């Protein structure tokens, strides 16, 4: 099944998934492996309908307050986040807007400009509830804000590859950025950098391919987020990679392996070599 890409704004802002119970037939853990193997092929053969009420403890409809200062346009629905009850809604090249849990508008998060706390090109948002911070990704920098819109700090990020590549803050002084393999020949896939944008560690990209004649870039999508944080860990999953990793300062640790079986996509059938 294909994931639903465009959920309504209110649903994205208010649905809370409290707990999910896994079907044991869908996951297997080998005693010799440090990660969980998810047998996709077997799961497809046993496909069944699941009601939202089976996996969600509570559903709340939250209308967003509409004011002259909070008019939303071109919402990045897949990048809506929540930080300690503050709902942050990003809009393409407009910045982000903060609302409380009742939908009342709080403040804009960053604005376009060239000064401290301002972006030249708005790309995405990330959050850290432990630090009570919201991060705005702009070209070559991450900007930190409090949920009330107060500017806190800026972090430089490496200017490598495409401008919309995603970044998150692993620690107070370390930024993790992904490199989209848009040419098929990227040397690295993840970069750890300090607050000045200097590279601390680079993780190699092993998935290489040749570009078809007449193409400049392979498949890439500025609406996809390959990095996120979950329970204090930084998580990474690339577009065509079958493994989900957690990232530390020193290594990539495999957590889940999606065993596609006969559904594994051949390299020559990938979107990146099929789009002309």
Where are these regions (language model features)?
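Eukaryotic scaffold repeat domains enriched in small/polar residues
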Residues: 20-276
């Amino acid at each position: 099944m294909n994931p639903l890409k465009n959920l309504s704004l209110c649903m994205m802002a208010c649905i809370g998934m409290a707990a999910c119970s896994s079907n044991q037939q869908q996951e297997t853990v080998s005693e010799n492996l440090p990660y969980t193997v998810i047998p996709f092929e077997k799961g497809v053969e046993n496909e069944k309908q699941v009601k939202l009420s089976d996996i969600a403890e509570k559903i709340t409809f939250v209308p967003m307050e509409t004011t002259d200062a909070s008019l939303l346009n071109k919402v990045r629905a897949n990048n809506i986040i929540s930080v300690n009850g503050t709902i942050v809604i990003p809009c393409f090249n407009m910045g982000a807007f903060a609302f409380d849990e009742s939908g009342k508008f709080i403040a804009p998060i960053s604005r376009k400009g060239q000064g401290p706390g301002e972006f030249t090109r708005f790309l995405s948002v990330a959050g850290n509830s432990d630090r009570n911070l919201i991060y705005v990704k702009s070209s070559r920098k991450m900007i930190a804000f409090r949920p009330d819109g107060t500017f806190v700090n800026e972090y430089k990020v490496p200017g490598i590859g495409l401008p919309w590549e995603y970044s998150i803050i692993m620690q107070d002084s370390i930024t993790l950025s992904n490199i989209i393999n848009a040419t098929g020949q990227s040397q690295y896939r993840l970069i750890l950098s300090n607050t000045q944008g200097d590279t601390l560690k680079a993780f190699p990209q092993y998935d290489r391919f040749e570009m078809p004649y007449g193409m400049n870039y392979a498949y890439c999508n500025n609406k996809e987020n390959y990095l996120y944080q979950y329970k204090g860990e930084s998580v990474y999953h690339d577009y065509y990679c079958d493994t989900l990793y957690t990232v530390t300062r020193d290594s990539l640790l495999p957590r889940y392996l999606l065993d596609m079986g006969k559904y594994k996509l051949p390299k020559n059938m990938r979107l990146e070599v099929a789009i002309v």
